[in-house]
Amino acid sequence: MSTFAIPRSVEWRETHVTILNQQKLPSIIEYIDLHTLEDVYEAIATLKVRGAPAIGITAAYGLALAALRYDTESLDEFRRRLKRDRDYLASARPTAVNLFWALDRLVTAAADALSVNEAKTTLVHEAIRIQVEDEDVCRRIGEHALSLFRPGERVMTICNAGSIATARYGTALAPFYLAKEKGIELSVYALETRPVLQGARLTAWELMQAGVDVTLITDNMAAQAIKAKGIGAIIVGADRIAQNGDTANKIGTFGLALLAKSFDIPFYVAAPLSTIDLTTKTGADIPIEERHPDEVTHIAGVRIAPEGVNVYNPAFDVTPNELITAIITEKGIIRGNYNATLPSLFTKEEQHETI
C-alpha cells in the first residue's frame, strides 16, 4: 500500500478548511470542517491538527479564510485586520516555528496587493502553494535521509513526524515510505510518546497503513530496545531549530539523543528549512509549551493518577546541537558547525522575519 492511502491531514474547500481529527486516531477516522478563525485556533491548540508543517498549513488556510470575509474595501483596514488575525492564530501554540513562518509568509505575500480583492486572491493562492511545496520538500528530505540507512536497518523514532503531520510523506518518517516504494526493507521502532501517545496512536497507525514494518514500544523501553534489537540509528522531527542547531522536539527527544551518544549510534533530525529559525540563536531562546495536567493524569479520558497530584507537563524539550549527528533538510544533509552551515542554506528572502 502506498503512502497515498494515508488520509491527508488538511484540505482547502473554498468556503472552509477540512482537517483529519488526529485526536480520534487510530480508532476513528473523522474529518472536521473548520469554518471560522476560532475553529482553526481551537483545532491547533487542542491537537486536532498537529505536526509543525501541518500546523503551518492549517493556520495559513485559516488566515486566508478569515480574510475572504473581511467586509472592507480599504487596504489599510484590510491589513490591520490581517495583522490582528495573524497574531491571534500565532498564539495557538508557542513552540512550533512553522506556525509563525506560514502566517508571516501570507502577510508578506499580500503586502504589495493593489486592491482588497487582489489581496484576498493572493492569500488563498499562497496558502495552497505552502501545502504543495511542503509535499515536495518532504519527499526530498526523505530521499536524503534514506541515503543514510542500510537495507535491513532498524531505526528508532519518537512522536509523529509522518504524513499526517505534513502535507504528505512527513519528515522523519519520509525515508521509510520511500524505502517501501523502492522495495528497500527498513524496520521502525516507534516510541509510544507519552503523554498524548502520538507514537502509538499516529506513527504506528500510519506506518501500518503503508505496509511499513513497525514495532511499538513504551518510552522507557528505548535503551533496552537499542541494545537487544540492534537499533542502528535514531531519527526524529523538529518543531524549531535554532541557528546553532539546538533542536526543540517532542518531550523525550533529548533523552533519546543521550541514549544515541551512549550507544554510539547516529542521531538524526529531519526538518524543512521552514523549521529553522535564524532569529532564535540557541535552544535557550526557544519557548517551551506546557500543557494541561489532564494529559498526564488521564488516558483516553480515564484518570490514572491520584486527584490533586502535582504535574509537570512540558510538550517539548531541547536537544543540544552537540548530540545531533546531522540535520536533514530538503537542501541536503548538514553535519556540525551549525552556526555557519544552517544560515548558508537560506537566501535572504527565505530567512525568518517577524512581521
UniProtKB/Swiss-Prot annotation:
GO biological process: L-methionine salvage from methylthioadenosine
EC number: 5.3.1.23
Enzyme superclass (EC): isomerase
Pathway: Amino-acid biosynthesis; L-methionine biosynthesis via salvage pathway; L-methionine from S-methyl-5-thio-alpha-D-ribose 1-phosphate: step 1/6
Keywords, alphabetical: Amino-acid biosynthesis, Isomerase, Methionine biosynthesis
GO molecular function per UniProt: S-methyl-5-thioribose-1-phosphate isomerase activity
Binding-site residues for substrate, renumbered to this chain: 50-52, 93, 198, 249-250
InterPro entries xrefs: IF-2B-related, IF-M1Pi, IF_2B-like_C, Initiation_fac_2B_a/b/d, M1Pi_N, NagB/RpiA_transferase-like
UniProt site positions, description: Transition state stabilizer: 159
Catalytic residue positions: 239 (proton donor)
Pfam family, one: IF-2B
Function noted in UniProt: Catalyzes the interconversion of methylthioribose-1-phosphate (MTR-1-P) into methylthioribulose-1-phosphate (MTRu-1-P).
Protein known as: Methylthioribose-1-phosphate isomerase
Lineage: Bacteria, Bacillati, Bacillota, Bacilli, Bacillales
Gene name for this UniProt entry: mtnA
